[in-house]
Amino acid sequence: MSTLVTQRSWIQRNRMTLTPLLFLTPGVLFFVVYVISPIIQSFNISLYDWDGMGQATYVGLANYEELLDDRAFEISIWNNLKWLALYLLAIPLGLMIALFLNQNVVGIRIYKSLFFFPFVLSQVVVGLVFSWFYLPREGLLNAVLTFFGFDTINVLGDPSMATYGIIAAGLWPQTAYCMILYLTGLNAVDPEQIEAGRLDGAKGVRMLWHIILPQLRPATFIAFVVTIIGALRSFDLISIMTNGGPFGQTRVLSFYMFEKALSEYGFRMGYGSAIAVVLFLIMLVFIAYFLWSMYRDEREARR
């Protein structure tokens, strides 16, 4: 009985500490099992030559050395850089649309619904819609070009244009996502600061730059994080629209990893894991920067 009383008193005394730990434990366990463990396994498998079924052969850093001379790997990295640079256009585009939708004009709810619509579509639907849009003969794009007297173009069949066509498809829903972030942020903008700015003569670009954008910094931060990670993880649109073609010119690291490790081109688990490790390290640089920025902002806010 005394032991039970002592135990209860210990739990009572530490309840404020134990309660958050109790709620955090399931999430931490899932994170360790489904995130940390696969990352460690990828590092380990990248040191082996393994087809996923038979005996694995230790090869050390041979897979990474092979990457240095792999032309397809070079193309994949270059395409990832294109995605990273052009995908960021979703942020200013989303901001401009949000600023427009934040006005009190006739039919604004209809406009909001139209711009919100791409966000609720899955990437599969977006890929199919833009595949039809780019069709060489029946597609809407070439119908418009023909109407205005221009020659038709095969966007997804041209190695020099295909990647840009896929990125344009990805920008459609990503811009809608950034728009939603900024609309939420605009609702939290302090109207007193805007009024004070107007009294000081600020309007237009000056109002946006000096008063509105500083208050939208949290939304901008989230938009950058999600957009950059989305650009580096691009896979589904490529798989649906070109399957890496034409001639492998639309591959990115995530798709090339899939081809080497799991598709009919390879079953080279070790080589695919090496590609995954490189992609993870690239993403880790951005994630570390974002975490440091969050820590720095929180530290400054406490002062």
Summary of predicted features, one role per range:
Residues 1-13:
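Short, Lys/Arg-rich, polar N-terminal cytosolic tail immediately upstream
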